[in-house]
């Protein structure tokens, strides 16, 4: 099938669009115009490619996880190692592209939201590189959970604003960043960190992240001599690492695509972030997408052990893939993600981010189902350094509970 989403109004099927107040429409249209101009200018992409190579360290390897594959005894698992990028995750692909775009637009200041802190660190890094002022909005809860990343951002010259509204997490940080953008439109560019928000943000983020899938596609051929893998797996919060892996394969219908959503304490509890499993269409942050909401359309709080996945919506293109049945979205609990985190560390010597651990956990299940004749690419979206203390505390608490139960 020929895939040409989004349309000129920013819709992916029935999802997407730009539902923004008049005050923001000018900025959004200005951004789209600048982005189209940059797409038509070969020097923009050449400069970006050079930065991705020399500064970020791309291309990232596609690594055959032989030990993990043998441990499971199922399909061959190839890891797309986005954890090896400068700053430790896929977020830099988009941050660098957007800061470079903002610089060309003549903007002086960069603002961004962040959950786990990875997008904040990536944005602060790119702003430092281009010598631009940078303010990062972060929910107060996440500031506590990710103290190390907060210090990193400050070290890189950014100012971190703790957001105390609402549930003090990622969605509240997005609200605060959007408000700030409205107030400072002339000299400020807002860098959305995922495939969310009003058009053209989901398209821009997808395009900058699609380097993941483009590289992986070619690397898979070079490594295996085969044309295509049987499946792709990536974790999904807002969905930027997943869309980056999936989009270059979207027309290859033989390739099954799986997004691993955060099921938290379980999809039948109130503590999860499984948007496509439990959500329904609604407008959030300027875009029509699937969102977790109550009977009255009020946005519900999302919950996950992983700060980067507890967003109550999902990128509109993922909602579209789900709607047309091009991709499947599967819930993975905190507990399963913790098992994935430990398993990959133990058998491959690679400590994954808690976000990526959701993808690993589902890949283990899928590998058993597919069997040894098949193969898959899993996006290892980030490294787990930022999560080690949290996991240590959680495992120690779990062990103490078990001890009490046996006493």
Curated annotation (Swiss-Prot):
Gene3D superfamilies: 3.40.50.1100
Cofactor(s) listed in the protein's UniProt record: pyridoxal 5'-phosphate
Keyword Zinc in annotation: no
Record's keyword terms, sorted: Amino-acid biosynthesis, Aromatic amino acid biosynthesis, Lyase, Pyridoxal phosphate, Tryptophan biosynthesis
A molecular function (GO) term: tryptophan synthase activity
Record-linked InterPro entries: Trp_synth_b_CS, Trp_synth_beta, Trp_synth_beta/beta-like, TrpB-like_PALP, TrpB-like_PALP_sf
SUPFAM superfamilies: Tryptophan synthase beta subunit-like PLP-dependent enzymes
BP term (GO), one: L-tryptophan biosynthetic process
GO CC term, one of those recorded: cytoplasm
Pathway: Amino-acid biosynthesis; L-tryptophan biosynthesis; L-tryptophan from chorismate: step 5/5
Modification N6-(pyridoxal phosphate)lysine, positions: 91
Reactions the enzyme catalyzes: (1S,2R)-1-C-(indol-3-yl)glycerol 3-phosphate + L-serine = D-glyceraldehyde 3-phosphate + L-tryptophan + H2O
Record EC number: 4.2.1.20
Pfam families: PALP
PANTHER family: TRYPTOPHAN SYNTHASE, TRYPTOPHAN SYNTHASE-RELATED
Family statement drawn from the similarity comment of this UniProt entry: Belongs to the TrpB family.
Reported function: The beta subunit is responsible for the synthesis of L-tryptophan from indole and L-serine.
Subunit note: Tetramer of two alpha and two beta chains.
Protein's UniProt name: Tryptophan synthase beta chain
Species in which this protein is naturally found: Streptococcus pneumoniae (strain ATCC BAA-255 / R6)
Record lineage: Bacteria, Bacillati, Bacillota, Bacilli, Lactobacillales
